[in-house]
Protein backbone atom coordinates (compact mmCIF):
# COMPACT_ATOMS: atom_id res chain seq x y z
CA UNK A 1 0.00 0.00 0.00
CA UNK A 2 1.08 3.52 -0.67
CA UNK A 3 1.90 5.52 2.44
CA UNK A 4 -0.01 8.48 0.99
CA UNK A 5 -3.57 8.43 2.32
CA UNK A 6 -6.17 10.59 0.57
CA UNK A 7 -8.00 13.19 2.69
CA UNK A 8 -11.59 13.80 1.55
CA UNK A 9 -13.37 17.17 1.79
CA UNK A 10 -15.49 16.18 4.76
CA UNK A 11 -12.41 16.00 6.99
CA UNK A 12 -11.67 19.76 6.96
CA UNK A 13 -15.42 20.49 6.94
CA UNK A 14 -16.05 18.49 10.12
CA UNK A 15 -12.84 19.79 11.73
CA UNK A 16 -14.10 23.36 11.28
CA UNK A 17 -17.61 22.56 12.50
CA UNK A 18 -19.17 22.55 15.93
CA UNK A 19 -20.97 20.03 18.07
CA UNK A 20 -20.48 16.96 15.87
CA UNK A 21 -18.89 13.61 16.81
CA UNK A 22 -16.57 13.89 13.77
CA UNK A 23 -15.14 17.27 14.77
CA UNK A 24 -12.29 16.21 17.05
CA UNK A 25 -11.26 13.10 15.07
CA UNK A 26 -11.09 15.20 11.89
CA UNK A 27 -9.12 17.93 13.66
CA UNK A 28 -6.70 15.24 14.86
CA UNK A 29 -6.30 13.96 11.30
CA UNK A 30 -5.39 17.45 10.10
CA UNK A 31 -2.84 17.74 12.92
CA UNK A 32 -1.40 14.41 11.79
CA UNK A 33 -1.19 15.74 8.21
CA UNK A 34 0.71 18.77 9.49
CA UNK A 35 3.15 16.63 11.48
CA UNK A 36 3.59 13.91 8.82
CA UNK A 37 3.25 15.61 5.43
CA UNK A 38 4.44 12.68 3.29
CA UNK A 39 1.68 10.49 4.67
CA UNK A 40 -1.26 12.39 3.20
CA UNK A 41 -2.49 13.62 -0.17
CA UNK A 42 -5.61 15.27 -1.57
CA UNK A 43 -6.69 16.74 -4.91
CA UNK A 44 -7.87 19.99 -6.42
CA UNK A 45 -11.43 18.63 -6.59
CA UNK A 46 -11.48 18.58 -2.77
CA UNK A 47 -10.70 22.31 -2.82
CA UNK A 48 -13.50 22.89 -5.33
CA UNK A 49 -15.86 20.85 -3.15
CA UNK A 50 -15.00 22.95 -0.10
CA UNK A 51 -15.73 26.12 -2.05
CA UNK A 52 -18.99 24.72 -3.44
CA UNK A 53 -20.35 23.43 -0.14
CA UNK A 54 -19.65 26.56 1.86
CA UNK A 55 -20.95 28.89 -0.84
CA UNK A 56 -24.09 26.79 -1.37
CA UNK A 57 -24.82 26.84 2.36
CA UNK A 58 -24.33 30.61 2.66
CA UNK A 59 -21.25 30.17 4.89
CA UNK A 60 -18.58 31.40 2.52
CA UNK A 61 -16.78 33.55 5.11
CA UNK A 62 -16.00 30.43 7.13
CA UNK A 63 -15.53 28.41 3.95
CA UNK A 64 -12.86 30.73 2.62
CA UNK A 65 -10.91 30.25 5.86
CA UNK A 66 -11.33 26.46 5.74
CA UNK A 67 -10.31 26.34 2.07
CA UNK A 68 -7.24 28.51 2.60
CA UNK A 69 -6.15 26.64 5.72
CA UNK A 70 -6.52 23.23 4.05
CA UNK A 71 -4.75 24.39 0.88
CA UNK A 72 -1.90 25.77 2.98
CA UNK A 73 -1.69 22.62 5.09
CA UNK A 74 -1.58 20.39 2.00
CA UNK A 75 0.32 22.90 -0.19
CA UNK A 76 2.53 20.53 -2.18
CA UNK A 77 0.28 17.51 -1.71
CA UNK A 78 -2.73 18.66 -3.73
CA UNK A 79 -2.89 16.55 -6.87
CA UNK A 80 -4.27 18.04 -10.09
CA UNK A 81 -7.15 16.39 -11.92
CA UNK A 82 -6.20 15.41 -15.45
CA UNK A 83 -8.32 14.40 -18.42
CA UNK A 84 -7.23 10.79 -17.91
CA UNK A 85 -8.60 10.96 -14.36
CA UNK A 86 -11.98 12.10 -15.64
CA UNK A 87 -12.01 9.36 -18.27
CA UNK A 88 -11.33 6.74 -15.60
CA UNK A 89 -14.01 8.31 -13.37
CA UNK A 90 -16.45 8.00 -16.28
CA UNK A 91 -15.60 4.31 -16.63
CA UNK A 92 -16.10 3.84 -12.89
CA UNK A 93 -19.47 5.61 -13.16
CA UNK A 94 -20.66 2.87 -15.50
CA UNK A 95 -19.91 0.32 -12.79
CA UNK A 96 -20.84 2.26 -9.65
CA UNK A 97 -23.99 4.30 -10.30
CA UNK A 98 -24.56 4.98 -6.59
CA UNK A 99 -21.22 6.73 -6.09
CA UNK A 100 -21.09 10.50 -6.65
CA UNK A 101 -19.14 11.92 -9.58
CA UNK A 102 -16.84 13.79 -7.19
CA UNK A 103 -16.01 10.63 -5.28
CA UNK A 104 -15.29 8.83 -8.55
CA UNK A 105 -12.93 11.63 -9.59
CA UNK A 106 -11.16 11.26 -6.23
CA UNK A 107 -10.97 7.48 -6.77
CA UNK A 108 -9.44 7.99 -10.22
CA UNK A 109 -6.83 10.42 -8.89
CA UNK A 110 -6.05 7.99 -6.08
CA UNK A 111 -5.48 5.19 -8.58
CA UNK A 112 -3.15 7.39 -10.62
CA UNK A 113 -1.00 8.28 -7.61
CA UNK A 114 -1.12 4.78 -6.11
CA UNK A 115 -3.13 5.63 -3.02
CA UNK A 116 -5.49 2.90 -1.84
CA UNK A 117 -6.79 4.45 1.37
CA UNK A 118 -9.14 7.40 1.81
CA UNK A 119 -10.03 9.13 5.05
CA UNK A 120 -13.69 10.02 4.79
CA UNK A 121 -17.01 9.86 6.58
CA UNK A 122 -18.58 9.23 3.16
CA UNK A 123 -19.61 5.58 2.96
CA UNK A 124 -19.90 5.77 -0.86
CA UNK A 125 -16.17 5.02 -0.97
CA UNK A 126 -16.97 1.58 0.49
CA UNK A 127 -18.56 0.72 -2.88
CA UNK A 128 -15.41 1.38 -4.94
CA UNK A 129 -13.33 -1.79 -5.34
CA UNK A 130 -9.65 -1.35 -4.56
CA UNK A 131 -10.21 1.48 -2.08
CA UNK A 132 -10.13 1.20 1.67
CA UNK A 133 -12.13 3.85 3.51
CA UNK A 134 -10.84 4.89 6.91
CA UNK A 135 -13.64 6.38 8.98
CA UNK A 136 -12.40 9.41 10.93
CA UNK A 137 -14.12 8.05 14.04
CA UNK A 138 -11.63 5.16 13.98
CA UNK A 139 -8.51 7.34 13.99
CA UNK A 140 -7.49 5.88 17.38
CA UNK A 141 -7.30 2.41 15.80
CA UNK A 142 -5.78 3.18 12.40
CA UNK A 143 -3.94 6.46 13.07
CA UNK A 144 -0.40 5.12 13.33
CA UNK A 145 -0.83 2.73 10.39
CA UNK A 146 -1.10 5.59 7.88
CA UNK A 147 2.12 7.35 8.78
CA UNK A 148 4.99 7.13 6.31
CA UNK A 149 8.19 5.52 7.56
CA UNK A 150 11.07 7.76 8.62
CA UNK A 151 8.85 10.38 10.24
CA UNK A 152 7.85 12.27 7.08
At which residue positions do the language-model features occur?
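Short, well-structured N-terminal submotif of metal-dependent ribonuclease cores
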Residues: 1-42, 55-64, 140-152
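Active-site-proximal, substrate-binding regions of enzyme catalytic domains
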Residues: 51, 55-77
Amino acid sequence: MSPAVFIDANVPIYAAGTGHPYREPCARILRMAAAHPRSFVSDVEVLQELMHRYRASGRWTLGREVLQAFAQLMHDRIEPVYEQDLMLAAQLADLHSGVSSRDLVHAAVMRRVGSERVISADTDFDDVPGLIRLDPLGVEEWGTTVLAPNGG
